């Protein structure tokens, strides 16, 4: 008779259970595997069976019980320090927990046990890459490939780091090797497409993305990358579709929502873009780029306080996000918070001293604040960083002209022709004759083209006479209808045309120029400014206005203009709020006021304060010839910075101009209350430090009383 030892059967059952648990793990039945090993007598807090502990840890990791998994693997290693599989599993866990330093040391311990383990080298490379150690990661992946050339994942990972390093041709080779090993791996086709796009091979990139989508039509990464390529190529509608498909497939794909917003902004759909950016933030609240782009959309929608908040949130998420600091400065500037804007631009520069845009923007704000030397330094720094920076060149030009430094200022002012946002940029393609570059005009036909405002033409019209004096045989002036009757009476102007006719006939001329280019080519300095045109009003119009105004009954007549063109970029600052702001003038006796307002401000003029002698002449003004005839009958014009000042001063009428507290036009220069452009006729009233319009108008009223030789009276 054969007997059986009592302990033999349980040992066989335990071994079978461990093997069964291992098989369950391999089959993905982790809960069953864990339940089985936990039922074993050897499995307790002091368990010493390394294989059992490894199975328990592996199943716990798969079930998301990460703390248990770490505990069991560390116990396994304590029990059997040379158990390589435990180090491998623990490394994967630590990498998942983003405990990269611990993961690195774990993988390095594994490699002391299995130095030729290609998978371990690959995983080590992944950890090193996550720690920002790209060179070490590359070395690890190359070692994995050397040990196992068919390791497709290692080739792909190598492609990632090579792309990051800008070694695009090497990256392409790595991805092509990965795809040769795994031709149906959609993600690898997408990554190859990203490299090809970076190489500028857009057709090849599109083919790679489409191959990825043929393998997996719901590949959100491929859809997102394809959308980016289509956006870059200008296929905005197709790009929108690709991004919308990406977020449909993966609604929480924050980057695709961000990219959809960007293409919607390119389509001028800022409200829709806002929705996309907010969707990105709903899925990733700390997404700095989404906060930043939301700020751009809100800024475009003129919701400035909200845009400011978005930029500040972007900075809170990513303090060194330079564009957010720069754009915050822009939105603060738009809210007239100039000192805060300057601080924001300085913070952008502190993070990136080579950001030309921030230096240029700082220059603009400092110029508006009146800090001209500092503004000049900022503009010059922007140009040192980017010599072809048109905005900075033009900003410096304006500053130099305002400072009376005409030699360099006029030369830089020509940069307006390189500014795509300026009307001047389009003139060159519109006219079919050469632009005048300063060569002799003797015997030539010159087309003078109005590109700038009405006031500019009245101020610089003096150069029509100068051009004729250089020997030009024929001067044709293309201008707006409101100017044509006035300039038709200017000596030396042979033809006054509308813009359409002038453009159609431009090939008949030897060259074209703008009046504001003439000072550069004729080398005008503050001491050699030509005298203004003396516009001579038509006698018939003067008599018509004399009849309209009637007898003055011994009172002096003063023309008033308190508002300019509402489309002017600085109108909000240079125009008075309303006629009521001029109330201090009503205290000066012996004056009859005449409103020269046309358009904006006419309603105020038609409904003056009770008892105030104000004649509203706007209804009868058809063009500048009418305004000139009316000004001829006045003794003084008091105005803000508008074309009326140029007209009155050109006619020799005394003109007092009230200037705004910020963004004063360069032509009025700095530090003087007169103008070399209109000597003896123009008087400038600058705001004193912190002075608002009401106080400035009080000073004008005092000057008016002194001019009249009377005492101002108190209003009831």
Task: Locate predicted features.
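Alpha-helical solenoid repeat scaffolds of the TPR/TPR-like class and their adjacent stem/linker regions
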Residues: 1-716
């Amino acid at each position: 008779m054969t007997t059986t030892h009592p302990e033999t059967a349980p040992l066989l059952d335990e071994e079978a259970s461990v093997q069964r648990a291992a098989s369950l793990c391999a089959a993905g039945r982790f809960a069953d595997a864990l339940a089985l090993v936990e039922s074993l007598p050897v499995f307790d807090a002091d368990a010493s069976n390394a294989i059992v502990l490894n199975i328990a840890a592996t199943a716990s990791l798969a079930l998301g019980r990460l703390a248990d998994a770490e505990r069991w693997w560390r116990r396994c290693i304590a029990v059997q320090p040379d158990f390589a599989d435990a180090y491998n599993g623990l490394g994967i866990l630590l990498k998942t927990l983003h405990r990269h330093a611990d993961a690195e040391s774990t993988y390095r311990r594994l490699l002391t046990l299995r130095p030729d383990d290609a998978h371990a080298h690959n995983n080590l490379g992944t950890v090193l890459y996550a720690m920002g150690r790209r060179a070490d990661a590359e070395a690890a992946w190359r070692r994995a490939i050397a040990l196992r050339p068919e390791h497709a994942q290692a080739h792909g990972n190598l492609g990632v780091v090579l792309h990051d390093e800008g070694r695009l041709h090497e990256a392409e080779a790595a991805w092509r090797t990965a795809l040769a090993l795994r031709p149906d791996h959609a993600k690898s086709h997408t990554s190859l497409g990203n490299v090809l796009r970076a190489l500028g091979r857009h057709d090849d990139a599109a083919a790679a993305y489409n191959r990825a989508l043929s393998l997996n039509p719901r590949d959100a990464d491929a859809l997102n990358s394809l959308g980016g390529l289509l956006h870059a190529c200008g296929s905005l509608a197709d790009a929108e579709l690709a991004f919308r498909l990406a977020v449909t497939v993966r609604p929480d794909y924050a980057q695709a929502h961000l990219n959809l917003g960007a293409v919607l902004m390119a389509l001028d759909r800022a409200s829709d873009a806002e929705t996309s950016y907010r969707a990105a933030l709903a899925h990733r609240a700390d997404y700095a780029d989404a906060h930043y782009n939301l700020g751009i959309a809100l800024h475009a929608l003129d919701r400035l306080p909200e845009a400011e908040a978005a930029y500040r949130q972007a900075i809170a998420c990513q303090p060194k996000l330079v564009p957010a600091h720069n754009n915050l400065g822009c939105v603060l500037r738009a809210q007239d918070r100039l000192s805060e804007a300057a601080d924001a631009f300085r913070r952008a520069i502190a993070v990136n001293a080579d950001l030309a845009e921030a230096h240029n923007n700082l220059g603009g704000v400092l110029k508006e604040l009146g800090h001209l030397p500092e503004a000049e330094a900022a503009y010059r720094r922007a140009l040192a960083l980017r010599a072809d920076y048109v905005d900075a060149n033009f900003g410096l030009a304006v500053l130099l002209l305002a400072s009376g430094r005409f030699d360099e200022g006029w030369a830089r002012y020509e940069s307006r022709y390189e500014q795509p946002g300026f009307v001047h940029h389009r003139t060159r393609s519109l006219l079919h004759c050469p632009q005048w570059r300063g060569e002799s005009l003797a015997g030539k036909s010159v087309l003078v083209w109005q590109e700038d405002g009405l006031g500019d033409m009245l101020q610089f019209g003096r150069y029509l006479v100068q051009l004729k004096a250089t020997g030009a045989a024929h001067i044709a002036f293309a201008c707006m209808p409101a100017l044509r009757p006035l300039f038709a009476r200017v000596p030396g102007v042979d033809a006054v045309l509308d813009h359409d006719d002038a453009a159609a006939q431009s090939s008949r001329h030897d060259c074209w120029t703008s009046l504001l280019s003439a000072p550069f080519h004729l080398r005008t300095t503050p001491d050699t400014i030509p005298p203004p045109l003396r516009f001579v009003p038509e006698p018939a119009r003067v008599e018509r206005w004399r009849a309209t105004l009637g007898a003055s009954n011994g009172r002096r007549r003063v023309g008033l203009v308190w508002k300019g063109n509402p489309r002017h970029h600085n109108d909000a600052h240079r125009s008075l709020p309303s006629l009521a702001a001029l109330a201090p003038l009503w205290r000066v006796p012996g004056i009859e006021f005449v409103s020269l307002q046309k358009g904006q401000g006419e309603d105020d003029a038609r409904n003056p304060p009770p008892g105030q002698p104000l004649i509203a002449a706007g209804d009868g003004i058809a063009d500048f010839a009418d305004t000139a005839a009316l000004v001829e009958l006045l003794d003084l014009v008091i105005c803000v910075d508008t074309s009326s000042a140029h007209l009155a001063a050109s006619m020799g009428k005394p003109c007092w101009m009230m200037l705004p507290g910020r963004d004063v036009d360069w032509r009025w220069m700095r530090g003087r209350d007169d103008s070399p452009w209109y000597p003896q006729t123009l008087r400038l009233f600058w705001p004193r430090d912190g002075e608002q319009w009401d106080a400035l108008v009080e000073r004008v009223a005092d000057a008016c009383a002194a001019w009249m030789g009377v005492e101002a009276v108190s209003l009831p």
